[in-house]
């Protein structure tokens, strides 16, 4: 408050009446005397005012004038007794819209709105329509809100922003009451001084910077949700990050390095930093408003009015009002600076409402759009510019580091091109964890394989984690490995491309004709490791693999076959190797005498599968005494069976008996529940034993893997305790028989024939059994041919041409009936 100027209030000596009228006209003005002022009387007495007072000259009327504080602290209430009667006020005070009353009311209203927004964000999510549930995909900044797929779920950025705004306005309200109380004690009302003292508080400056940051981030996330194209999402994200960073820097400098009453209005800027801070705030607000209005115009069919949701017009009005607040107050700052004494509080809560209400508006628009398009074509919008986000095939197969040594510690880089190296996806945390586990287990298993042990463990671990790698043998000597490595260097690019296709292939070109399932890139370039399961009918749809190098031994090929690690697969390898040694005793076509060319990793063809079924039936009926299903001499067959099953009689009987009991074409015969339970228990026991041995040998020092397995086990136990598995054993069971399959009569005929042969009757010759030489059940020559260098074509599958006609089946049935009748007839004397 400005001090009073020294002037003469009371004349020193009375003069004439003319002089008195002149001085009265000059001094006829009421004067406000502030507190702690001193009045000096003519006799030298000094009077100190303990409270504000008013001096009334002699010309003043009897009525008491009103005391109104002006900008300088003094206000004159001049009264001319000749012209007017009554109190008169000067125009030196602030207008009402710039006084303390509108400021206090605006602050109270914005505080209530801020807390209302917080309550809206924390209430229970709800859905607007039954079929209008919006699913936003995975969590993340560029993928929407909380990611739960329920309308009403809010992102945490909006919650934090609304909460910080409510806290900031609460602090501003408390400071405003303190300053207003001080002014009331002095009898003053200064709105600008009140606002400057409140906004220049240190606590409010800090919380305001934090609140503004979260507000801009929440608005950026809302904009990202509006546009579905990934390119637009990325552009919005990085543009918003840049503008928010600059705004944060300049706002901090403006608050702490350039404090002052003239740094908040455009017309009173004296430095560049306050102007830049105001410019970035205005740019963020205007850009957000422009993009939201553009989105509403694109969705004008649902945005402003819809018959299924008539209150959407109210939400649209609130959204437009909240996003236009920065533009409106920018115009007011330029035109009427005094009017916006309380505009900062409105901008504050308007930014929070612009994010929350617009999010609600967008959810309603998407709900209406999904409800209307629910019966349309299923799928996802694909844009032309999204190819830029696809991963290149070269980037997904990074070369192994030179510091990483090979399985035998030689440290060479032979596997860097993709033939034997480890391959994981770039940027995938799960892939990196799996690769670390695979590295430890692969190194330990390779050390064991160098000593000629754990073939099953080695190939099971590799087949379960990687593609097929034919150069990682189990029982190959060092010389053979060097030769193989030297040979592979000559054909490295083609072999690498053939054996290691990219995990994420590029988008195929649009095809004008239907896609051929046999003429695809996957069938020509992918090598699959197939695990044989007795309950599935495996058909080979892969093309011919190239013949392996001649350095590969028989033990290596047998090790490649063993990919499942079960006793059944081990016995399968032995049964494959056994007939090769007895080919000289049985006649076969010239094609059958050829050496088995490709390894048995991928080849489980149709003839081989049928041969396995037939051999399993023969082994089951004869309890391991017969090896070749098409042997002509029973004595020779028994001799061969004794030689082949001498070392593994018990394992073969158990494995093949289990396989025969679980074959799918034996569904026509009645099987008891005990047999099924026994087979399942045998298989589970063998798998559990193999798993225990594998974990005990390869993962002994893999502490991280063991800790993760322990955590998973404990989590499963806790989940079972919280939500136990429902008891389904007591529920009624209805057995629905399967429909008759094509070839069921043939299978039944074969089973009856095998049962008669197992009961001790002489076995008919192959020329008397036309059915057994059919393509459905291959003979020994066909079985050898299926493993030879001429495999079946990828276009071959089960069709009607491979199934014998009903006439042949009936003829075979009559022939078998006549033979059985002849055999049962007593011999003639």
UniProtKB/Swiss-Prot annotation:
One GO term describing the cellular component: plasma membrane
Keyword Membrane (UniProt): yes
Membrane-spanning ranges: 35-55, 104-124, 160-180, 234-254, 273-293, 312-332, 339-359
Biased composition (Low complexity): 634-653
Topological region Cytoplasmic: 56-103, 181-233, 294-311, 360-829
A Pfam entry, by short name: PalH
Basic and acidic residues bias: start-end ranges: 604-615, 692-702, 716-726
Ranges per topology, Periplasmic: 1-34, 125-159, 255-272, 333-338
GO terms for biological process, alphabetical: cellular response to pH
UniProt subcellular location: Cell membrane
Biased composition (Polar residues): 776-796
Keyword field: Cell membrane, Membrane, Transmembrane, Transmembrane helix
Membrane topology label: Multi-pass membrane protein
Location of the region described as Disordered in the Swiss-Prot/TrEMBL record: 1-23, 389-522, 537-702, 714-829
Extent of Pro residues compositional bias: 502-512
Primary location class: membrane
Record-stated family: Belongs to the palH/RIM21 family.
Functional description taken from the UniProt entry: Required for the proteolytic cleavage of the transcription factor RIM101 in response to alkaline ambient pH.
Protein name listed in UniProt: pH-response regulator protein palH/RIM21
Species, as recorded: Pyricularia oryzae (strain 70-15 / ATCC MYA-4617 / FGSC 8958) (Rice blast fungus)
Organism phylogeny: Eukaryota, Fungi, Dikarya, Ascomycota, Pezizomycotina
Gene coding for it: RIM21
């Amino acid at each position: 408050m400005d001090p009073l100027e020294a002037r003469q209030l009371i004349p020193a000596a009375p003069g004439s009446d003319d002089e008195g009228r002149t001085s009265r006209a000059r001094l006829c003005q009421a004067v406000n005397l502030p507190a702690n002022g001193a009045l000096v009387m003519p006799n030298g007495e000094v009077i100190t005012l303990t409270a504000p007072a008013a001096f009334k000259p002699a010309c003043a009327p009897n009525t008491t004038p009103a005391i109104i504080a002006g900008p300088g602290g003094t206000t004159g209430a001049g009264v001319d007794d000749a012209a007017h009667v009554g109190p008169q006020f000067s125009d030196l005070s602030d207008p009402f819209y710039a006084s303390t009353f509108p400021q206090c009311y605006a602050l109270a209203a914005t505080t209530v709105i801020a807390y209302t927004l917080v309550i809206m964000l924390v209430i229970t999510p709800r859905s607007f329509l039954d079929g209008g549930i919006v699913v936003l995909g995975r969590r993340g900044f560029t993928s929407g809100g909380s990611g739960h797929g329920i309308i009403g779920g809010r992102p945490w950025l909006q919650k934090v922003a609304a909460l910080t705004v409510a806290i900031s306005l609460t602090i501003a309200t408390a400071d405003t009451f303190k300053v207003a109380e001080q002014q009331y004690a002095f009898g003053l009302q200064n709105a600008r001084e009140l606002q400057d003292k409140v906004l220049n508080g240190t606590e409010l400056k800090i919380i305001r910077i934090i609140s503004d940051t979260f507000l801009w981030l929440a608005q950026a996330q809302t904009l990202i949700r509006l546009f579905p194209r990934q390119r637009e999402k990325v552009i919005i994200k990085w543009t918003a990050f840049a503008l928010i960073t600059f705004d944060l820097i300049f706002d901090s400098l403006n608050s702490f390095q350039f404090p002052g009453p003239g740094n908040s209005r455009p017309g009173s800027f004296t430095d560049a930093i306050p102007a830049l801070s105001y410019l970035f705030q205005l740019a963020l607000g205007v850009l957000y408003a422009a993009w939201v209005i553009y989105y509403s115009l694109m969705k004008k069919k649902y945005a402003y009015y819809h018959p299924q949701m008539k209150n959407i017009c109210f939400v649209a009005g609130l959204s437009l009002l909240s996003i236009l607040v920065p533009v409106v107050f920018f115009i007011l700052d330029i035109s009427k600076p005094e009017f916006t004494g309380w505009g900062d509080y409105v901008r504050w809560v308007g930014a929070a409402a612009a994010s929350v209400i617009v999010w609600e508006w967008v959810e309603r628009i998407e709900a209406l759009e999904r409800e209307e398009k629910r019966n349309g074509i299923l799928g996802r919008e694909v844009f032309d510019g999204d190819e830029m986000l696809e991963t290149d095939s070269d980037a997904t197969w990074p070369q192994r580091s030179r510091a990483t040594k090979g399985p035998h510690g030689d440290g060479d880089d032979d596997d860097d091109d993709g033939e034997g190296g480890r391959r994981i996806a770039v940027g995938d945390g799960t892939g990196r964890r799996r690769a670390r586990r695979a590295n430890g287990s692969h190194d330990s298993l390779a050390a064991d394989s160098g000593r000629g042990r754990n073939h099953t463990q080695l190939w099971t671990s590799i087949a379960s984690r990687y593609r097929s790698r034919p150069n990682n043998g189990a029982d190959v000597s060092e010389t053979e490995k060097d030769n193989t490595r030297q040979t592979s260097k000559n054909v490295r690019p083609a072999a690498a491309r053939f054996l290691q296709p990219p995990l994420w292939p590029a988008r195929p070109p649009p095809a004008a004709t239907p896609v051929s399932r046999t003429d695809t890139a996957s069938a020509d370039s992918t090598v699959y490791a197939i695990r044989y399961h007795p309950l599935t009918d495996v058909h080979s749809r892969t093309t011919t693999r190239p013949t392996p190098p001649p350095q590969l031994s028989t033990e290596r090929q047998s090790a490649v076959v063993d990919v499942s690690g079960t006793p059944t697969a081990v016995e399968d390898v032995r049964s494959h190797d056994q007939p090769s040694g007895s080919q000289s005793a049985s006649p076969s076509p010239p094609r059958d005498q050829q050496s088995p060319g490709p390894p048995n990793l991928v080849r489980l063809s149709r003839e081989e599968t049928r041969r396995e079924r037939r051999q399993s039936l023969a082994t089951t009926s004869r309890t391991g005494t017969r090896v070749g299903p098409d042997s002509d001499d029973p004595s020779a067959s028994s001799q061969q069976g004794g030689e082949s099953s001498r070392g593994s009689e018990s394992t073969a009987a158990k494995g093949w008996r289990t396989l025969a009991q679980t074959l799918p074409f034996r569904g026509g015969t009645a099987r008891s529940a005990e047999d099924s339970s026994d087979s399942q228990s045998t298989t589970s026991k063998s798998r559990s034993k193999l798993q225990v041995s594998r974990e005990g040998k390869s993962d002994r020092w893999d502490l991280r893997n063991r800790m993760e397995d322990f955590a998973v086990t404990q989590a499963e136990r806790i989940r079972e305790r919280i939500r136990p598995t429902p008891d389904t054993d007591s529920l009624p069971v209805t057995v629905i028989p399967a429909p008759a399959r094509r070839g069921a009569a043939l299978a039944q005929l074969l089973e009856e024939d095998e049962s008669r042969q197992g009961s001790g009757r002489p076995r008919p010759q192959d020329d008397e059994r036309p059915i057994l030489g059919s393509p459905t059940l291959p003979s020994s020559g066909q079985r050898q041919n299926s493993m030879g260098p001429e495999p079946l074509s990828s276009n071959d599958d089960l069709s009607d041409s491979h199934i014998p006609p009903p006439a042949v089946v009936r003829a075979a049935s009559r022939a078998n009936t006549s033979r059985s009748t002849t055999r049962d007839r007593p011999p003639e004397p």
